[in-house]
C-alpha cells in the first residue's frame, strides 16, 4: 500500500464526514491530499487532519478529476447529483446514503461479510455502504449464517438519535434539559417527544405498514448475503440515547445449534467482541459509543423454537455503522482491486 491517493470527503462538516476524516487519520490511510467538500453554506470552514487545518471547499467548484476515492455522506440528493459526475471522472465513490444501495449493478458491502462484492465497483465506479442497523446485524450474523444457515430473522432495533443527525442530538439534549426544569418542549426533528420516550417509527411508513428503515434491513440483508430466501421481520425504534444502536435479534437457523455452538463461531469472528457470561452484556453507552467493534451478548437458545437462537447486538452507528465501514471498504479496494 505504498501508493497514496487523493481523497474527497463530501459532507465534511457533518457528523459522519468528520468521523470519516478522523478514522482515515487513525488508520493511516495512504492519503496524498485530502479534499473536504460541502455545500456553499458550509464551505470556508476547516477540518483538522494530521495536525493541520484543512479548508472545506465548495462542491460546486470542485474538479473531480483530482480525486481517486470519494466518501459521500451529504444525503441522497447530493449523492444523486454528484456521484455519477465523480465516478465518470475516475473517482471511486463510496456512498453512505441509500440512493444507490438497491441498484443491481452497485455493490453493497460490509467488509467482514461480503468483501468479494467490491470487485464489481467498476460497473459504475460506485460502492454503496449499507444502513447502520443492517451493518451491525450482519457482522454478527455472518459467522452463524456460514456455520448453520439462517432461514428467518426477527429483529427489534433500539436506535440512537445520532442516526438522525446533529439536529436530533441537540433536540434530545434540549428536551431533557427543559423537561427536568419543568419547561414545555416543542418537538421539531421528531413528530413526538424523544426525551424519556421511545418512538416506534424511523423514516416514513410504507404501504405494507413497515417503515422504510425496517424495509432497508429486509432488502439489504438479502442483497448482501445473496440469499432471497432469508425472511427478515424488523421493528425499528428510536430511543433517547445519543450514540450507539442496539438490536434484539431472534434467529431461526437451518441446522440446529446450541448457544455454545453459536458462541464458538462468534468468538474469533472479525469485527466482533463477544460477551460470553450471562451476567455481562454490552450496552450502547458503556461499550459501543466511540468504539469500533460490533458487540454481541446474551446469546441463548430460544425456548420457543427448536432452531431458535437469541442474541443482543450493539455498535456505534456513526463509526462501524457508517464512517468506519466506508473506510474499511476503501482499504479493501486499494489492497485488492486498485
UniProtKB/Swiss-Prot annotation:
Cross-referenced SUPFAM superfamilies: Glyceraldehyde-3-phosphate dehydrogenase-like, C-terminal domain, NAD(P)-binding Rossmann-fold domains
UniProt: substrate binding residues: 159, 238
UniProt keyword NADP, yes or no: yes
GO function term, MF aspect, one: aspartate-semialdehyde dehydrogenase activity
The entry's keywords: Amino-acid biosynthesis, Diaminopimelate biosynthesis, Lysine biosynthesis, Methionine biosynthesis, NADP, Oxidoreductase, Threonine biosynthesis
Catalysed reactions listed for this entry: L-aspartate 4-semialdehyde + phosphate + NADP(+) = 4-phospho-L-aspartate + NADPH + H(+)
Residues annotated for NADP(+) binding in this entry: 13-16, 41-42, 162-163, 187, 317
One family name in Pfam for this protein: Semialdhyde_dh
InterPro entries listed in its UniProt record: Asp_semialdehyde_DH, Asp_semialdehyde_DH_beta, NAD(P)-bd_dom_sf, Semialdehyde_DH_NAD-bd, Semialdhyde_DH_dimer_dom
EC numbers, comma separated: 1.2.1.11
Catalytic machinery residues: 132 (acyl-thioester intermediate), 245 (proton acceptor)
Quaternary state and interactors: Homodimer.
PANTHER family recorded: ASPARTATE-SEMIALDEHYDE DEHYDROGENASE, DEHYDROGENASE, PUTATIVE-RELATED
NCBIfam families: asd_B (TIGR01296), PRK05671.1 (NF004224), PRK08040.1 (NF005957), PRK14874.1 (NF011456)
Record protein name field: Aspartate-semialdehyde dehydrogenase
Source organism per UniProt: Shewanella sp. (strain DB6705)
Gene: asd
Amino acid at each position: 500500500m505504498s501508493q497514496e491517493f487523493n481523497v474527497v470527503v463530501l459532507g465534511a462538516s457533518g457528523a459522519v464526514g468528520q468521523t470519516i476524516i478522523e478514522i482515515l487519520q487513525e488508520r493511516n490511510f495512504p492519503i496524498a491530499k485530502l479534499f473536504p467538500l460541502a455545500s456553499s453554506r458550509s464551505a470556508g470552514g476547516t477540518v483538522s487532519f494530521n495536525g493541520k487545518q484543512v479548508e472545506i471547499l465548495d462542491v460546486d467548484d470542485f474538479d473531480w478529476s483530482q480525486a481517486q476515492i470519494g466518501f459521500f455522506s451529504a444525503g441522497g440528493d447530493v449523492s444523486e447529483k454528484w456521484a455519477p459526475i465523480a465516478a465518470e471522472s475516475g473517482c471511486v465513490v463510496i456512498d453512505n446514503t441509500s440512493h444507490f444501495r438497491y441498484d443491481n449493478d452497485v455493490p453493497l458491502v460490509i467488509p467482514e461479510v461480503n468483501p468479494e462484492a467490491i470487485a464489481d465497483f467498476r460497473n459504475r465506479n460506485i460502492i454503496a455502504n449499507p444502513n447502520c442497523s443492517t451493518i451491525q446485524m450482519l457482522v454478527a450474523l455472518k459467522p452463524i449464517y456460514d456455520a448453520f444457515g439462517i432461514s428467518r430473522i426477527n429483529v427489534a432495533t433500539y436506535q440512537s438519535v445520532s442516526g438522525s443527525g446533529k439536529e436530533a442530538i441537540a433536540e434530545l439534549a434540549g428536551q431533557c434539559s427543559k423537561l427536568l426544569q419543568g419547561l414545555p418542549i416543542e418537538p421539531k426533528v421528531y413528530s413526538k417527544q424523544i426525551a424519556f420516550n421511545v418512538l416506534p417509527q424511523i423514516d416514513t411508513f410504507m404501504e405494507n405498514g413497515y417503515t422504510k428503515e425496517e424495509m432497508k434491513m429486509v432488502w439489504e440483508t438479502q442483497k448482501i448475503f445473496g440469499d432471497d430466501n432469508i425472511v427478515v421481520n424488523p421493528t425499528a425504534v428510536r430511543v433517547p440515547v445519543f450514540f450507539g444502536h442496539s438490536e434484539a435479534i431472534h434467529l431461526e437457523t437451518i441446522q440446529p445449534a446450541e448457544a455454545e455452538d453459536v458462541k464458538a463461531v462468534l468468538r474469533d469472528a472479525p469485527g466482533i467482541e463477544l460477551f460470553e457470561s450471562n451476567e455481562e452484556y454490552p450496552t450502547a453507552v458503556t461499550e459501543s459509543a466511540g468504539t469500533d467493534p460490533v458487540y454481541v451478548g446474551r446469546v441463548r437458545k430460544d425456548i420457543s423454537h427448536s432452531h431458535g437462537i437469541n442474541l443482543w447486538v450493539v455498535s456505534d452507528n456513526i463509526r462501524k455503522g457508517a464512517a468506519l465501514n466506508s473506510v474499511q471498504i476503501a482499504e479493501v479496494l486499494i489492497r485488492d482491486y486498485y
